[in-house]
Swiss-Prot record:
Cofactor note text: Binds 1 divalent metal cation per subunit. Can use either Co(2+) or Zn(2+).
Protein name in the entry: 3-dehydroquinate synthase
Protein family (similarity comment): Belongs to the sugar phosphate cyclases superfamily. Dehydroquinate synthase family.
Function: Catalyzes the conversion of 3-deoxy-D-arabino-heptulosonate 7-phosphate (DAHP) to dehydroquinate (DHQ).
EC number(s) from the headed UniProt entry: 4.2.3.4
Stored PANTHER family: 3-DEHYDROQUINATE SYNTHASE, 3-DEHYDROQUINATE SYNTHASE, CHLOROPLASTIC
Binding site for NAD(+): 70-75, 105-109, 129-130, 142, 151, 169-172
Enzyme class: lyase
The encoding gene: aroB
Localization: Cytoplasm
């Protein structure tokens, strides 16, 4: 069973997202029109899927691999340099090269950024292997590496040629990784009331990993993101900002833990709860709404407990570095109801007072 949908960005060419019930890498062959292929993956995914992927490629291609260490802390300049050096050392050229990102969000982000900057832009293909990367980072063209002072601070908007994925990847995905991915899925429920109701009525099947339900879940999640990206590909109008619900707080958590604590999806889960509580603090929603929204997050196995190893001063400093901020104004994605999120400016003083009472 294959589900296919199209992403139509504002400025870039359209591309397909292919969600498969089985794992059949041959579906991407029609998109590999280049003769030089560099497969970027990590040590974990390489052991599981690299051999099968390489076997699916035709014989007349010049195929090389670049295997990075696994973990958010390796979404770095050093890893980027390794990819670029591999391309240069093997004389890969702009018009004959395609990069393939075989892995989760870190691999997709760093490979996409390498594609964006190598010889001013080469083709790349996304093969996301985690639930989180399937529904979020592989769609929409955000590519980046981290800086020691902040997450995703060095990057570009650059769209893939195609996204291919399969729910069969879940067989080798830990329960922790699966639940981390569910946080990004739940994020879309706060953006779309229809999806909120669908998730609510299909919770048991989702937690039981029913294959038909999961394909529909991934498809619906990608559709919501694709619709937003079509309106505001490069975050010029502010429409795309709602996709960052939970991320302002979440990114700060990751930064404070040096990307070695909570996984990205876990941090987003906590971040959404923080954004919900901040919305209540500001009077945008009632106490009962805040409880209902947080209970909805928790009902999918997602923890909303704030880590106890984070210093409030350091956390506040990390939030001040958020990319949405401008002219020293703090900007947050806040909630007024299901399907009603908005980008709002708040003062540093308001945030400090909220953090004081919420810790």
């Amino acid at each position: 069973m294959i589900s296919k949908l199209s992403v139509n960005p504002t400025f870039s060419p359209s591309y397909n997202i292919i969600v498969d019930s089985v794992l059949d890498f041959s579906h991407i062959l029609e998109y590999v029109t280049n003769k030089q292929v560099l497969v970027v993956t990590n040590t974990t995914v390489a052991k599981l899927y690299l051999t099968k992927f390489l076997a699916a490629l035709v014989d007349d291609l010049d195929v090389r691999t670049c295997i990075l260490e696994d973990g958010e802390q390796y979404k770095s300049q050093q890893s980027l340099d390794k990819i670029l050096s591999t391309l240069l050392e093997n004389h890969f050229t702009r018009n004959s090269t395609v990069l393939v990102a075989l892995g989760g969000g870190v691999i997709g982000d760093i490979t996409g950024f390498a594609a964006a900057i190598y010889q001013r832009g080469i083709d790349f293909i996304q093969i996301p292997t985690t639930l989180l990367s399937q529904v979020d980072s592989s769609v929409g063209g955000k590519t980046a590496i981290n800086h020691q002072l902040g997450k995703n601070m060095i990057g570009a908007f650059y769209q893939p040629k195609v996204v291919y994925t399969s729910i069969e990847f879940y067989k080798t995905l830990s329960q922790r990784e699966y639940i981390a991915g569910m946080a990004e899925v739940v994020k879309y429920a706060f953006i779309s009331k229809d999806f909120y109701l669908w998730l609510d009525s299909n919770r048991d099947k989702i937690l039981a990993k029913d294959s038909v339900t999961l394909i529909e879940m991934v498809k619906r999640s990608c559709q919501i993101k694709a619709q937003v990206v079509a309106m505001d590909e490069k975050e010029l109008t502010g429409a795309r900002a709602i996709l960052n619900f939970g991320h302002t707080f979440g990114h700060a958590i990751e930064k404070c833990q040096n990307y070695r604590g909570l996984k990205h999806g876990e941090a987003v889960g906590v971040g959404m709860a923080q954004a919900i509580d901040f919305s209540h603090y500001l009077g945008l929603i009632s106490q009962q709404q805040a409880k209902d929204f947080n209970d909805f997050i928790v009902s999918f196995g997602i923890s909303i407990d704030f880590p106890n190893d984070i210093c409030q001063k350091e956390f506040l400093e990390a939030m001040l570095l958020d990319k949405k901020n401008s002219n020293k104004e703090l900007k947050f994605i806040l909630i007024e109801n299901i399907g009603s999120l908005s980008l709002q400016k708040q003062s540093k003083n308001e945030l400090e007072q909220f953090l004081d009472i919420s810790r």
